Each structure stands twice: as structure tokens, then as C-alpha cells.
Design a protein with these regions (language model features):
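A structural signal for well-ordered alpha-helical scaffolds and beta->alpha junctions
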Residues: 14, 53, 122-125
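Alpha-helix N-cap/helix-start motif
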Residues: 30, 81-83, 114
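Hydrophobic-ligand binding "helix-grip"
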Residues: 36, 51-100, 106-110, 138-139
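Short acidic/glycine-enriched loop/turn segments that link adjacent beta-strands
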Residues: 42-44, 67
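Short aromatic-glycine motifs in intrinsically disordered, low-complexity regions
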Residues: 44-51
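A conserved amphipathic terminal alpha-helix motif
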Residues: 100, 106-150
Length: 150
């Protein structure tokens, strides 16, 4: 099983960040490479358009508004992976001085090495979190890791 994860400091409260990213259909306002998102199945499935005209279909697996977190799986995508499960969460920092946003996923690489698949999502998560932080203030730190677990 392969994995990728990223974390970034954002200089505003967790509640403010969650207002922007906490909806399962809320990617286009903050994620530049997803210009369009439409939901089906009562909002539990989202169909994402990417700039190349491709479609990614994702299913909401778990949503916890109080914890500011949701998990989703990929149903259909042009990526070399299977059994993808990701979580996005927002955590208030102690003292109320901003928040941490975490985005992580586990998956099985298909037709490529675990490292290659991890790099794909590592870049996606890093770029996405940088774009998110830029909406509020310059980012102070991006910590990113990608791991392959045999």
C-alpha cells in the first residue's frame, strides 16, 4: 500500500478555513486544477472536471463537521491506482493562532511503482494546500511526505 500526505499552516482560524473547504462539493473555489464539481446521489458523489477535460468521480465516505474532517474514495479516475482513500482535516492550533490543514491518502499503485503513484498525489496535495493558504495569507510551512509501505 502506498501513501502520500501533506500539511500546511494557514494563518486564519480553523473555522474560517473549514467554511471554504468543508463542503464535499467545494473544491473549485480553492483548488485551481478542479474548475468544476457536480454532485449526485444526494451529495455523496462528486464528478470533478480537470483542465485536460478528464473526469474524476469520488465518493464521500465519512463526514465529521465538528471535527472539521471528511474522507473520500475515488470511484473513477485516469490515475494508476486502486483502493484510494483520502482524508482532509483542519485543526485549530493551540492559542488560536491559525490552523493546520492535513490532506492524506492511501492507495494501491497499478502499473507504476508505489513511489511514482505517491509522487503524483504528493504534488497534488502540496499544490492544492499552497493554493488554499494563498487565499488567506502567505504560507509559513509546507511539510510533505510520501511513503510506500510494502
Amino acid at each position: 500500500m502506498a501513501q502520500a500526505s501533506a500539511c500546511i499552516d494557514v494563518a486564519v482560524s480553523a473555522d474560517i478555513v473549514w467554511q471554504l473547504i468543508g463542503g464535499f462539493n467545494s473544491l473549485p473555489p480553492w483548488l485551481p486544477y478542479i474548475p468544476k464539481s457536480e454532485t449526485t446521489e444526494g451529495g455523496r458523489v462528486r464528478h470533478l472536471a480537470n483542465p485536460n477535460g478528464g473526469t474524476i468521480v469520488e465518493r464521500l465516505e465519512k463526514f465529521d463537521n465538528a471535527a472539521r474532517s471528511y474522507s473520500y474514495s475515488i470511484i473513477q479516475a485516469p490515475f494508476p491506482i486502486a483502493d484510494y482513500l483520502a482524508t482532509i482535516s483542519v485543526h485549530q492550533k493551540a492559542g488560536g493562532s491559525g490552523c493546520l490543514v492535513d490532506w492524506s491518502a492511501t492507495f494501491i499503485a497499478k502499473g507504476v511503482s508505489d513511489s511514482e503513484a505517491s509522487k503524483l498525489f504528493q504534488g497534488t496535495f502540496e499544490d492544492g494546500l499552497k493554493a488554499l493558504a494563498a487565499r488567506f495569507a502567505p504560507s509559513r510551512r509546507v511539510g510533505l511526505s510520501a511513503h510506500s509501505v510494502q
